[in-house]
């Protein structure tokens, strides 16, 4: 059998569990509206109606996107009276947004 360069080279793959976690994280973020919401929430806490207005989405769409982001552990919510406020709880999100800003020059 002939030995190739690839056989002798050590390939540095990320561990499978890390790749699975990254794919799940990116899947949760993989929508322009969700990215816009995260970008907004990096600037502070906002009520659902404020997020809807600033992100130019309907209240129903806003709630669905926020629900998904929260289910992935990116956000937390707090009800105060009749208003629900959201904020970022994931320490990884600011770095992800910075990476997008730096590398996605379209």
Model-derived regions: residue spans:
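Conserved segment of winged-helix/HTH DNA-binding domains
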Residues: 22, 26, 85-106
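Pre-recognition alpha-helix immediately N-terminal to the DNA-recognition helix
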Residues: 35-39
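Helix-turn-helix DNA-binding motif, specifically the short coil turn and the N-cap/start of the second
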Residues: 58-61, 89
């Amino acid at each position: 059998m002939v030995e190739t360069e690839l056989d002798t080279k050590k390939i540095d793959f990320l561990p499978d569990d890390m790749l699975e976690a990254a794919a799940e994280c990116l899947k949760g973020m993989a929508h322009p509206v969700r990215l816009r919401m995260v970008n907004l929430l990096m600037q502070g806490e906002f009520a659902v109606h404020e997020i809807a207005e600033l992100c130019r989405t309907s209240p129903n769409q806003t709630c669905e996107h926020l629900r998904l982001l929260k289910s992935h552990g990116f956000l937390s919510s707090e009800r105060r009276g009749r208003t629900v406020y959201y904020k970022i709880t994931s320490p990884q999100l600011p770095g992800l947004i910075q990476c997008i800003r730096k590398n996605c020059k379209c």
